[in-house]
């Protein structure tokens, strides 16, 4: 039986609540699904802050994907390589030295593959 595939563009936005490391996470990939990211993009709309770390999070374990040591304010940083995010995992991006009320954006573009026996 063929896999069912849906194209997705998943935008996320968060306002940092206190000074320190700001973190934004995607939703966890649902059971029976795999998210194939063809592009992952991050920005801090508010200001130039500390280093950006992009990773895949699976429970308490993280797998690093990219690192940007000196990002500019309100500039998109993209990870253009195809990345498979399995069920239960999520994409996470952290930025050091954020201040309260910084606005962080994360956008995932790609497609979702469904197991043949999973209803959408």
Task: Say what each PLM segment does.
Residues 1-120:
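Beta-strand-centric surfaces of beta-sandwich/beta-rich domains
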